[in-house]
Amino acid sequence: MHPAAEHSPLGKSSEYIATYTPSLLFPIPRAAKWAELGLTAQTLPYKGVDFWNCYELSWLLPSGKPVVAIAEFSIPADSPNIIESKSFKLYLNSLNQTAFDGAARVQATLEKDLSAAAGKLVGVRIRNLAEIEEEGVAVLPGVCIDELDITVSSYDQPQPELLRCDDSQVIEEAVHSHLLKSNCPVTSQPDWGSVVVEYRGAALDHASLLAYIVSFRQHSDFHEQCVERIFLDLQRLLKPEKLTVYARYVRRGGLDINPYRSTEVLDVDNRRLARQ
């Protein structure tokens, strides 16, 4: 467990405060988890963003009438801190009985508070339900590898030694799996996700990739660090010209988390998947 997470509200009984309380936000420094992967803020081998989508955003108009909306938050992958997820939820709930004179004021408030917690500018987009309905459900790019026949015997920790490639071939492809699962390092609750790998490099053996993804099944770590670990393991193996790893996790408490790490300019489709 990250030492800072021990002091967060995650896994503890919490009072739900319904009036604006920005002090509820609990930042967790990324540095300790980067260090586990041999990284520092100055040596990150990727660009990236963590997309958080909130489906339970509500506030009051000055008249007292409630408003509901969906919010998208984009937290830079090189921000000094992540925001602990339960504290994020408690903070958003604190808007429920607070009056704002419009969505623009809500957006500005969210940007100010979340940027202060993350230590870097956080993008905020507030959307109405009709926009989301019109977008529909996204389909991940590339080939789904979930029907491949594999034998699995260990689930306790990621096993990069399972990964195989043919370095006599250089190819460009996208593959994805819906079998990503890990556990919250604080509560041990399951985190269910889908993951996309897009790259140009040595030809990756798809069955070995699937076995590797499944090896995360009982691993305890935050969403962001799971994706960073996958990125680094594939980068070491493939030595790719370009590489993107993008995971979309099932929501919990009205929030889903979607980390994106890439060697390329960010080009992210943040539409929800069928399980989101």
From Swiss-Prot:
Entries under Gene3D superfamilies matching the protein: 3.30.1130.10
Organism: Pseudomonas syringae pv. tomato (strain ATCC BAA-871 / DC3000)
Pathway where it operates: tRNA modification; tRNA-queuosine biosynthesis
Keyword Cell wall biogenesis/degradation included in the entry's annotation: no
Keywords: Cytoplasm, NADP, Oxidoreductase, Queuosine biosynthesis
Its job: Catalyzes the NADPH-dependent reduction of 7-cyano-7-deazaguanine (preQ0) to 7-aminomethyl-7-deazaguanine (preQ1).
Residues at the active site: 184 (thioimide intermediate), 191 (proton donor)
GO cellular component, one term: cytoplasm
Annotated binding of substrate, by residue: 83-85, 223-224
Protein's UniProt name: NADPH-dependent 7-cyano-7-deazaguanine reductase
Broad class of where this protein is predominantly found: cytoplasm
NCBIfam families cross-referenced by the UniProt entry: QueF (TIGR03138)
Residues reported in the UniProt entry to bind NADPH: 85-86, 252-253
Matches recorded under SUPFAM superfamilies: Tetrahydrobiopterin biosynthesis enzymes-like
Enzyme Commission no: 1.7.1.13
One MF term in the entry's GO annotations: preQ1 synthase activity
Family assignment from sequence similarity: Belongs to the GTP cyclohydrolase I family. QueF type 2 subfamily.
Catalytic reactions on record: 7-aminomethyl-7-carbaguanine + 2 NADP(+) = 7-cyano-7-deazaguanine + 2 NADPH + 3 H(+)
Subcellular location: Cytoplasm
Assembly and interaction partners: Homodimer.
One matching Pfam family: QueF
GO annotation terms (biological process): queuosine biosynthetic process; tRNA modification
Coiled-coil zones: none
